[in-house]
Amino acid sequence: MYFTYYLKMTEKKSKLAVLKTKETAESVVDFINKISKEELRKDSHIILEMMEKASGEKAKMWGSSIIGFGNKRYKSPTSGREVDWFLIGFSPRKAYLSLYLMTDHKEYATQIEKLGKFKTSGGCFNIKKLQDINLAILKDLIEASL
């Protein structure tokens, strides 16, 4: 799960580390519309719609570059520290979209295998182009994360 990885990395940096990625009041649509690469901007709008529909939640900015849906209180298994975090989310990066899903990769290995062309990093799915992805399977993985 992405969040567990993120929290562990934050805790390794400092015993008293403060989680910097928090919900903000910035406009999600304005953020997406500022993306210079047209294909990445269009793909971001598609993911935005998919995640809003699946979660029933309005998108919120988390930090300066992550779009999250929903809110959950998580407790670190190592430190016991509790923080607020989104249920699912994504971030348009320079070269790809990072999807933050709370899907158990082992449990959904068959679906993930059929998802299409992507890479994983720290529990994220990094996708260069949505046209290389099976959107029906992606929808199922998004729903499984909720």
Each language-model region and where it sits:
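Charge-dense, helix-prone N-terminal extensions
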Residues: 2-146
